[in-house]
């Protein structure tokens, strides 16, 4: 049974139909990528999972229907790092991290995860009293990820994590994601504009076009798929 399964999911913004019956799944311990042009429905797919947009169809997580309130979704074990990072600019690094654990009640576990997070991201430890808005783009992306990890999620949703970042910063970020997946079994659903990076970092991938799944399969196979190569890989 998949950890996450979407069946016939549709969503709209007013008169605009953003998703048109999307079927998608993520297995336990799997990294899955979602590719597509601007307006294809990638971000809306993540918003549908997080219940920040109204949907129809079936959304199932760990064998149960997902609730349709964002905080309730977070309590199920899904953490969402949105496009643009979504950190609270006026709050300190420390305050952002502690807000990430707001759905938890296990104080000892939160303290252990806080310490572990600062060990994983030493620059955040150095700057934990600093306002998030004063951090560099790469540091803000680290903070957004660290805050999500404070939820202790089973599934991590990442929306365009490489956007606006230098190649070295992007490589380091995806190295952390790979480590979390390999060492802790964290499942990841990532929307990514860099198709080459997304396919190299994932086990399976979906290509969305105008709100529908146009192509799906193993990432290694999609790297050889003619239309994917032509439209998204540039060769």
Label every model-predicted segment:
Residues 2-235:
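Glycine-rich phosphate-binding loops of nucleotide-dependent enzymes
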């Amino acid at each position: 049974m998949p950890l996450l399964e979407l069946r016939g999911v549709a969503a709209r913004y007013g008169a605009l139909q953003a998703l048109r019956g999307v079927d998608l799944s993520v297995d336990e311990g799997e990294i899955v990528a979602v590719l597509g042009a601007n307006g294809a429905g990638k971000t809306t797919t993540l918003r549908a999972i997080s219940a920040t947009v109204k949907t129809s169809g079936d959304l199932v997580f760990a064998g149960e229907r997902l609730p349709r309130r964002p905080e309730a979704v977070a309590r199920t074990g899904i953490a969402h790092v949105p496009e643009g990072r979504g950190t609270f600019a006026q709050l300190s690094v420390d305050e952002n991290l502690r807000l990430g654990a707001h759905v938890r009640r296990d104080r000892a576990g939160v303290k252990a995860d806080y310490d572990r997070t600062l060990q994983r991201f030493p620059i955040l430890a150095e700057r934990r009293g600093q306002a998030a808005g004063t951090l560099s783009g790469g540091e803000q992306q680290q903070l957004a990820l660290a805050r999500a990890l404070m939820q202790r999620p089973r599934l991590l949703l990442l929306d365009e994590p490489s956007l606006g970042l230098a190649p070295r910063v992007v490589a380091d970020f995806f190295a952390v994601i790979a480590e979390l997946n390999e060492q802790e079994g964290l499942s990841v659903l990532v929307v990514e504009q860099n198709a080459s990076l997304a396919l190299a970092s994932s086990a399976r991938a979906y290509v969305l076009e105008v709100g529908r799944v146009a192509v799906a399969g193993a990432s290694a196979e999609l790297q050889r798929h003619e239309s994917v190569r032509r439209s998204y890989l540039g060769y």
